[in-house]
UniProtKB/Swiss-Prot annotation:
Pfam families: Pkinase. Residues 1-28 are lumenal. This is Eukaryotic translation initiation factor 2-alpha kinase 2. It comes from Plasmodium falciparum (isolate 3D7). It is an enzyme of class 2 (transferase). PROSITE patterns: PROTEIN_KINASE_DOM (PS50011), PROTEIN_KINASE_ST (PS00108). The keyword Cytoplasm does not apply. Belongs to the protein kinase superfamily. Ser/Thr protein kinase family. GCN2 subfamily. Its EC number is 2.7.11.1.
Amino acid sequence: MLINKRKRRKAYIYNDGYEYINKKIKNKFIFICLIAVGGFSCVYKIKKKEKKEKKGKKKKEKYYYDQKQNCKDKFYALKKIKFHANPKNLKEQILLNLREIKYLNLLKKYTNIVYPHEYWIEIYKPFYKQKKIKSDKKKKNKKKIKKQKLSLFKDTIKIIKKRKKDKLKKKKKIEFFFKNIQYSSDTDDIKITFEDAHPEKVKNNNNIKDIKYIKKKVQKDYKKNNKKNDKNNVNKNNTYNNKYKVVINKIIGKKYIINKIKINRNKKIYIYRHMYGHIYGHMYGHMYDLFNINKNSYYTYNNNNNNNNNDKFKSLKGLKRNNLFINKNQTIPYPSSCYYYSSHTTNKFKSLNEKQFTYVSSFSSHMWCTASRRKTFSYNQKDNYQEIKKLNKYYNYKSSNFLDKQILNKQSMFYQNKINNKKNDHNVVLKTLQTFYDDTYIYNLENVDTQETKQYSNYNNIENVKNVKNVKNVENVKNVENVENIEDMKKKKKNKFVIYNNIYTMQNIKYTSYKSNVFFIDHDVNICNSYSLPNIFTCKTKNKHNAFFFPRHTKFNNRPSKNKKYRLSQRKYYINNYKNKGIKFKLKKIIRKMFQMKNKLRCVTGTYINNYKIGKTIVKNNKKNIKNNNNNKKNNNNNTNKKKYYFYNQHSPCIDIFKKTKRRKKKKKKKKKKKKITFINLLFNNQIKYQTKNCKNKINNIQSRECAHKILSCHHVFILLYYIYKNKTSISELLYEQYINNIKKNFLINKLINLYIPIYNYSEYSFNISFIYYILSNKKRKQFKPTNILSPQVYSYFYYSNVLFGSRYVHQKKKIHRNIHKSKLSNMYAHLSNLDLFLCYRNKHIYKYIKKRQALFNFFFYKRSYITHYEKYFTNKHFIKTQKSQLKHFTRRPTLKMSENNYSSKNYILKKCYMFKIKKKIVKNVNIRRNKNMCMYLSYVIHIIKSHNLCNKINKEFNKQLTNNVCKKKVARQIILDIFYNKTHPRHHIIKYTYNFYKKNICLSGCKKRIFLKIYCFHKGGYVFSRLYGREIKKKKKIERIRNIQVQKQMDYKSRPFINNKRSSKISKQIIYFSLNIILKNYIDYILRKRYFLCSYDHNLIERKWLMYYFTKVVSKYFLNPRKDNNNNNIMFNNNNIMFNNNNIMFHNNNIMFHNNNIMFHNNNIMFHNNNSMFNNNNIMFHNNNIMFHNNNIMFNNNNIMFHNNFIVNNYMDKYKNMFIKSCNDKSIPYQMLANLQNEYYLSKGNNNKMNITTTYLYMKIRKILNKYSKRNEEKKNILKGKYCYNNGNFALLSYINKKHKHNKRYHQIKEKNGNNKETKYKFNLYIRMEYCKSTLENYINTRENMNINRNYEIIQMIILGLYSIHNNNIMHRDLKPSNIFISDNNIVKIGDFGLASYDYTYPKNRKRKKRKRKSSNLSYEYNIRKTNILNLQKNNTPFNIDKYNNNIIRKKKEILFKNCCTKNNIPTKEINSNSSFQYFTKKKKKKKNVHDHHTLGIGTKIYAAPEQLIGNKYTKAVDMFSLGLIIVDLFTITKTNMERMKILCNARHRILPDLLIKNHPQVAKLCQNLLSLDYHLRWTSEELYKKKKNIYIY
């Protein structure tokens, strides 16, 4: 489309959910906004300008039927126009509609379009500006006017410019537009028509007379008001009359005009929609003349229609224009209506029977009007189309309920249930939950674009209360049983009635409208409204009903009011009589307490949540009311004032609850106490609302109307008041058993998820709910009080078995909560406490749903305005002001204190958890790191992990390795996911988590998979853990004392066994639970927002069995079995799955997990699987042992390196040395370590009670044991002579040579066997387990069919990264070729085969360290251990093959190489191994070498080796760069045979590259020529290539 050509110079500003367009684009997009099908709302700013009147003059009353006073009000269009449309969204939304309908052909006829501000200018033009009209221009313009079919946007721009310059063009183009306005699409089946008036009316004489009458009035008024300006204004009357004709023709004819409605009160934002009579909206008198209706006939009513009550349409046939359609107080013009043809259904449905029409009723331009409504109904061609047109002409939404035949037939489910079920059934909740989604036509629409409907709000309307003499409503007659009583009421008294229409419409989908009953009540009525966007924000002027519709914040403050009347309204709520039968309802204690707190049930707008407003009326005892109302006689007594209860919302399930309640006794009323009910607000899910004035006033300031709209329009939460009565029925049964059978699951859910419709239940796939949880307080359980419940936004199935903490949460006596219904919602309530919520996702549909819900979470959960305000309140109120009160209550319970300096920092530091023992006072300071923002914000959850000192080290190292090395972030995620989905370890080890208390801080490990469980367990037992591990406790008595304190009175601590529940610790408990709830909720949101957490069907973390089984074991064993202790003071839970060591074993934050004494270290791709030990650091450097892990390439340069099956490397602290010595079996071995090592190595137990020792530790032990004894020299000689020998295939250890081992039988057996041997041999068998890579680069080159250039670039960059790390450590590979480059399963390239690698001694830094390294490299020399040769050398000079592609033979000869690489020239070598890679060994004494003699000659593969490596004595690390150049040539050439490949490589050694490579890849050819240069000083180094990274190929 043409939108793509636009230059976007300025960024779009996002403000309060509205997106504004740049000023330069406004002319383009207003055209689309006006013409877009489906009611797209465009905003156009029009400013009203009024003259200031003098102070002395009285203000004149404005009557809108005359034009005199209206001359003062001048409307003009501002230049600065803002729209709510983003061109990005317009592409996706509107233009999709245009493509589907092929509506572009239609739009070509809209080239002459008129905007509202231009109408105003044309009307009022003679009053403020006018110029002389020249006759010459008329002749010229007549020739130019033709039907021009041009592009959309160019025409609109040209027309607007021309109208500003030329006035005559405007007239004729307007006339041309309204003459040729017949619309037609490509198919002739449908014509879009505006039905308010037809061009036939112009022919009527009555209309013409009325127009003349209007002209005379206007001319007289004009002359009176404008006598002064007669000289300047020439031909004023003629121009005005001509324009007045045009305007009237526009009104009578078909037109397209847009009306405005104000959205926000503060900002000047308007919605404009199609409106008839916008120009003459202020003229009351003219409207009667235009439509040929007498003023007196508006309020007459045809009484003959009262008799026909059975037929729905008989009353409609007799209607005339004098019927009741306009109210007395109505100041708006006669509203019109028009048909839209919806954009979605054209291409999908062929027949007219399935096509869809939307009925849009107009609305007032005044601010007090409630809202606009959009009703949709399906239309069948067979039905009387013309009759429906006539009905819709005279339809007025203010006071009539007449809709189409389809709407009348498709009444609401509530209405049908009430008619069918005349008896008082108890299943009212079921009926209320059956919404309009049962319509069969919905299922025809399968795939709906979600982006079209995101920005459209739902319009839910309620008509005004009106005073009418004679009331008749055809639809609602059935709702009332006694028709005779109603007629008597009509005759005797004027009645006020309410019409409640709750109509949900989106742009593309059709729903039926449903209505609630009409209640005839003697007094004023509060009208419930499901508040939508226009309903909230359109109320500006002072209206009598504004207090009912739109309560202000000031009126309903949280403070208790001083007046008695307002107190009643704040505390008591009532329900109306069900069907006006006089049934009395009285509430039980729970329900009444629920409704005492009005602010808890109110939403952010000051309106009540979703539809659950409960009104209140007090009816006085009037005799007239008793006589008039037969239905209310039962309720009223002669002596007392009775109260009426009524619900306006029929959705609420409370009706069922109120029915079943019994009367309370008078004694209970007297003994009532004020009790608090906590309610979860939608905006602050984890918010604790304290009963203080400051809190409530500050929170109310946050609750603005704009934020409320975002919640109410996008997300309606169905609120359950849960209560089970006599074990008969429960809401969960109704929801999950009966109602699901009525809904088609497959069709509905796909639509509902895609459309963001406000849904009250999502069936069994996902149920959107928030709970109110309240427990009656008994005398025996005074300590238990209600707490806030965490309410995540997505639930499906909740599985809570009775095993959770035993069954001790269930009250045995009164049994309020029951565990009868398993795998249902009712089971959830049985265990609701602070954080006893787990999410159990059982269906794949939820993953799709969560993706769609991310926008809603970001929409109203992650706004900073809420967080910052509440943060200030929280810190000021509870941390600073209440420090003194908290310090008093330190006995036997933790309190949380915060300083003034810390509350503004990033983390709250809740200081000083105090604990007192019975005998001795032990005070421990534990710094608990918590979140800054006490609200839901995702980035701070990650900040909790990163803020700790120990975790910072891990994160820094991990990030460095990600940036510097080949490992990418995807690989890191895969490692975490492997642990997460149990690919690396069995299912038992799912729930293993370790608490780290280091330096008095609670440290959370960096692994993301364990955050959820850690925080959960910290809440349940965190304080216990902190108390246990604060100091070293060795004796069992002390441990038992601490446990006795912590688990005091277990029967009383049913909900929180580790915290006392006394009155003095209220604030501390609230702060604790507040902080903990937020962290867990943050992590739940974090799980919901990440894709890879919920991809699988059976998620391990979320599985019910494992969560419940392991967690109950941990908590129940720890709290309920305090006296059970294992050996060595180690508490083991979950079959050695979770280790809690009382001896303060620190599981240090290098992501080490103890799984059955098997530590897992994840190196990038180096896996040591001996007894499940894995290295978890990406690059572990053991330089002291000369074990080099360089980018997953292992260097083994020593001849004596020992590995054992049970080698484990652990990190512990120095203070735990004694414990580890005791835990070892061999207590005689002292503990001592090397000082040079960065990591200290300790001992731990093995499976077979053997010592697990590292290589360096083993050498240290041997040396220290030998040097301990008095006979050191003798034993050294004996060792050298070979008297002591212990041969084993797997293990050799000399630690048995100890004085204490003399009593050991095995010691004497060794002596007897080896006593005769003069020479002993110590055999050390080296076992190296390495990663298996399936393929090599050579296989990749041979097997590929086509050349993948991007893959070649990746391979080269990975090789450069490997060479960079090798060369930084002064190592030369010297045998780099495709067969030595491996490719792993993750397509990561790895360099291997370091058999020929050596140090670059020519490097100047290595010359000084030469002597040191030689000594340190030979550990056998230091430890006095005899040398051995690991490799079996081949002394004979036998020939061998270098490579399978080159069959040249190499022998000892001193011939010069390198005239032609492929000729048979032999390489001078010395002793040669049988493999292709070989090394030089001698048994002779070493001679002193010069610097040039360090590197051997003739090493490497002939083809890939550099020339100086084969000939010269001196070469450097540039040797590897030469072979890299040949590998690049090999990658970028494809050959069919090996001979072609060898020729290309031989020519490349002479810098002769193939022609195709130079043509297709010139940059790669330049790189190869540089790397293949004979002078190694000219070659690029690995550092230079690594620094360039992406710019490697640019030179």
